[in-house]
A protein has these predicted regions:
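Short beta-strand elements
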Residues: 182, 596, 752-764, 805-813
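Inter-lobe coupling/hinge segments of SF2-like helicase ATPases
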Residues: 275-284, 288-295, 301-738, 754, ...
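C-terminal structured "cap/appendage" subdomains that terminate the fold
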Residues: 747-784, 790-794
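Accessory, non-ATPase domains that flank or precede helicase/AAA+ motor cores in DNA-metabolism machines
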Residues: 1-442, 454-470, 780, 788-792, ...
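Short beta-strand micro-motifs in enzyme catalytic cores
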Residues: 5-7, 197, 723-725, 773-775
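Surface-exposed amphipathic alpha-helical segments in non-transmembrane regions
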Residues: 702-704, 710, 745-750, 784, ...
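Short secondary-structure junctions
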Residues: 15, 590-593, 748-757, 801-806
């Protein structure tokens, strides 16, 4: 039978239950240009709706009349490399997402098209006959009349507006089947490529000078020619701006073939270092020893993974710089991931100073155009060093040699929306594909990573001392129960007050850390006990003093606070401390002392993290009050005091990682102190000073913490001694959610009961969010294909089964909540 060229295509409209590569015919005009990694428009589903697709592979197949042809090719060149296509397919299997979900994570938003469906009247349509064919169906007649009223070409959105609350899909499908309408797709790029025009002489220098003598009555044209005779080539806009000539003068010279205009791609870039690259500082003996071991792994012909444990201020970044230098010298590229956008300005400044224009930055805070152009620079090989947050792990780097994840224990490397990937898992896959070195760095490594290093999965390196023999901060534990007994019910202990006073006297800076925004966590009535709760979520509202608003930090609901209790008219009390309340308390204790608050609300007002950080350094503001974004990676040489308020807050929650998160948080924030010449101090305020995790964090003793924590996890059978896989169900009706969860639990117990501990249904910590109830079934199991296949099967079944149509079901590896 005749073999024809076909393409395996991932289709945007395919849901997880129906997601697979679909086979399409390749029309003759596309056989020479179509390649894997190109996007196409294809007819999809029963109604042949135009839909975007990504070509995953080319093949030959027997001719079959049921095969649909590709409508058109959208990309002249592939936008995905074969490696990134393999990554998307792997993510589909690993993270329970569609291939297109993975593609949306891999590619920047600026590369996508806005695709709209357009319904067109068939050629030579007889309108009266067509309306007669519609019979008594009001919906078919309305759809046809709407298309005809718009000149025979009508977008789907317009038809949906005409139908109001009703769905036009059935009527449109019938009209297409009767060949009264045809369906087309119209696509528009989200971000367009920017081009710059450059002007140069199109004639010899002698001819240009002769033209100058002839054109004395055209001074603007003369000015343009004279400038180009002098400098040779320049931006057309700059030539007009410098000479004062209008663009019409330039166009006249181009038309007369005296000046030539060439276009070149222009890359919109974030602010970056523009000086000459400088040499990287020398390593200390301890750093050089670590670097030597890592350099050997970097040169290995096989993929390698290593964990670098270094106390805060030990100089891990300097080791990174030397490794990247080695990778570049070998013709390889490097990616460095940081956990927070707030860390990228410092990292970019440092790395650009040594590698110049070879550095690109990728994070969600960039404008779409800048992020798209940075992606293009990386893809074109113009940037060989990438610095960014979680999504930078997908940078289209060819010949990747080194991938570094700094502060690898941070939760921000895990995506909480589809696809629910962890950057560390993606990094392992990419390094395996490129035979590259994966380096995990941290002062408080993830317990699982440390276990893998101990058992030989990762190579292990340590920097146990601070750079240049600087001491770790001296830490004081402040017992807040004793403070209450002494009559101090404020947020600042007497110990911390004394240390702040001393720092102000010395002219040194301090940081106060509290992991909560707002002024007060809870507003309650002193008489009847009534509280303010979010109408959409099962949480209380947080009071923000600056605008006197009560805010839900889950759904964004806002309302003004009342002057008195809306239930009984009693006096309102504001309980709990937030960053705004701490700032007010500091001002009350130290009148006239300037403070800087760094949380999400303050950043929204300032515009960027960088603006606040620069103010803190430049103006030497005495006290910074911040949330979790100040706990890691930032380097302030004049900060000699750190105060940790409510250190117990993350300790007593229902999560097996509570100890680890608390230890890491305290250790990281304490590590911001004493990074300059002056010694550092830290005060940890706690209601449980005898707690072993608090005491280990105060001593900065990671090894002791790890030993106690790994023993506890082995006893409980939690990671790394098992894998956690959760299936979450959400819906507007709580009973429907619980019923679906119970079905999923029973399914797992019947199919994989002996290979997994099945728990649930259990509500999530915030059971109702945005008016949707959320319950979960959790598996503690060994990682296996059978368990993952069972999870994928039940997710697909529940999302297509009519009896569960009122709920949404998804699976997740090692969820954060």
């Amino acid at each position: 039978m005749l073999q024809i060229p076909v393409a395996k295509v991932a289709v945007l409209a395919a849901t997880f239950a129906f997601d697979r590569p679909y086979t399409y015919k390749i029309p003759q005009p596309l056989t020479d240009t179509l390649r894997p990694g190109c996007r196409v428009m294809v007819p999809f589903s029963r109604g042949n709706r135009p839909c975007e697709g990504m070509v995953l592979a080319l093949d030959q197949a027997q001719d079959d009349p049921r095969l649909k042809p590709i409508t058109r090719q959208l990309d002249p060149e592939p936008i995905l490399s074969p490696e990134l296509i393999r990554l998307a397919i792997w993510m589909h299997d690993r993270f329970f997402c569609t291939i297109y979900d993975a593609l949306h994570a891999i590619l920047p938003a600026g590369v996508w098209y806005r695709v709209s469906t357009v319904y067109c009247a068939a050629p030579e349509l007889d309108a009266d006959a067509a309306l007669a064919l519609c019979g008594r169906s009001k919906q078919r007649r309305l759809a046809l009349e709407t298309v005809l009223a718009h000149g025979g070409r009508c977008p789907l959105e317009t038809l949906q507006t005409a139908f109001g609350d009703k769905d036009p899909a059935s009527a449109l499908h019938w009209l297409v089947e009767q060949k009264l309408l045809t369906v087309e797709g119209a696509e528009k790029r989200v971000v367009r490529d920017k081009q710059l025009e450059y002007a140069s002489l199109a004639v010899s220098l002698e001819e240009a000078q002769e033209e100058i003598r002839r054109r004395r009555r055209a001074p603007h044209q003369v000015a343009i020619l004279e400038l180009l005779c002098t400098i040779g080539r320049a931006s057309a806009d700059e030539v007009c701006q410098f000479t004062g000539a209008p663009k019409s003068s330039m166009k006249t010279l181009v038309r007369q073939e005296l000046v030539r205009i060439d276009t070149e791609p222009y890359f919109r870039r974030p602010t970056h270092y523009t000086g000459q690259p400088k040499p990287i500082p020398a390593l200390t003996a301890a750093q050089a020893e670590v670097f030597s071991g890592l350099q050997a792994l970097l040169r290995s012909p096989d993929a390698q993974a290593a964990l670098l444990f270094g106390v805060t201020g030990s100089g891990k970044t300097l080791v990174y710089l030397h490794l990247i230098e080695q990778a570049l010298a070998a013709g390889q590229g490097a990616i460095l991931l940081v956990p927070e956008i707030s860390l990228t300005p410092q990292m970019i400044e440092a790395f650009s100073a040594y590698f110049g224009d070879a550095v690109a930055v990728l994070h969600s805070g960039l404008p779409l155009s800048e992020r798209y152009d940075e992606w293009k620079r990386i893809r074109a090989g113009l940037a060989r060093v990438v610095v960014g947050t979680r999504s930078a792990v997908f940078a289209p780097m060819e010949n990747l040699g080194l991938l570094i994840i700094d502060e690898e224990q941070e939760d921000t490397y895990k995506s909480e929306s589809t696809p629910r990937y962890h950057a560390r898992d993606v990094a392992k896959f990419r390094c395996a594909q490129h035979r590259a070195l994966l380096l995990l760095g941290s002062a408080t490594p993830d317990v699982v990573s440390r276990y893998y290093a101990e058992t030989g999965r990762y190579h292990y390196f340590t920097l146990p001392d601070r750079f240049n023999a600087r001491k770790l901060p001296d830490v004081i534990l402040a017992d807040m129960k004793q403070e209450l007994r002494n009559g101090n019910s404020g947020s600042i202990s007497s110990v911390l007050y004394a240390e702040l006073e001393e720092n102000l006297r010395r002219g040194e800076q301090s940081i106060l850390f509290l992991n909560r925004r707002g002024a007060s966590k809870l507003v309650t009535c002193a008489e009847c006990g009534a509280t303010y709760s979010c109408p959409n979520c099962s949480v209380s509202l947080t009071y923000h003093q600056g605008n006197q608003m009560l805010v839900c930090h889950h759904c964004g609901y806002r309302q003004r606070v009342d002057d008195q209790c809306p239930v009984c008219g009693g006096e309102l009390r504001f309980l709990g401390d937030g960053t705004e309340r701490i700032e007010a308390d500091v001002h009350a204790l130290f009148p006239g002392v300037e403070t800087l608050r760094m949380d999400a609300d303050a950043i929204a007002m300032a515009g960027t993290h960088e603006a606040l950080l620069q103010r803190f350094v430049r103006e030497r503001i005495p006290i910074m009050i911040g949330t979790q974004m100040i706990t890691k990676g930032l380097n302030f040489e004049n900060v000699t005091l750190v105060g940790v308020l409510n250190a117990d807050q993350s300790l007593y929650v229902g999560d097996y990682r509570a100890n680890e998160r608390t230890f890491s948080l305290i250790t990281q924030v304490v590590g911001r102190s004493g990074r300059g010449d002056a010694p550092g101090r830290a005060v940890i305020q706690t209601f449980t000073p005898a707690n072993e995790t608090i005491r280990q964090a105060a001593r900065q003793d990671y090894d002791a913490f790890y030993r106690s924590e790994i023993a506890l996890r082995q006893l409980n059978g939690t990671p790394p001694f098992s894998e956690v896989l959760a299936v979450t169900v959400s819906g507007a009706q709580e009973n429907a959610v619980v019923r679906c969860c119970a079905y999923i639990r029973d399914y797992f117990r019947q199919t994989i009961g002996e290979r997994a501990e099945v728990l649930g249904p259990a509500p999530l910590p915030v059971v109702r969010m945005n008016n949707r109830y959320r319950y979960r079934v959790t598996l503690y199991c060994s990682q296996s294909r059978e368990v993952r296949r069972a999870a994928a099967n039940i997710v697909m079944y529940c999302n297509t089964e009519k009896s569960f149509r009122d709920v949404t079901v998804f699976a997740d590896d090692n969820p954060l909540d």
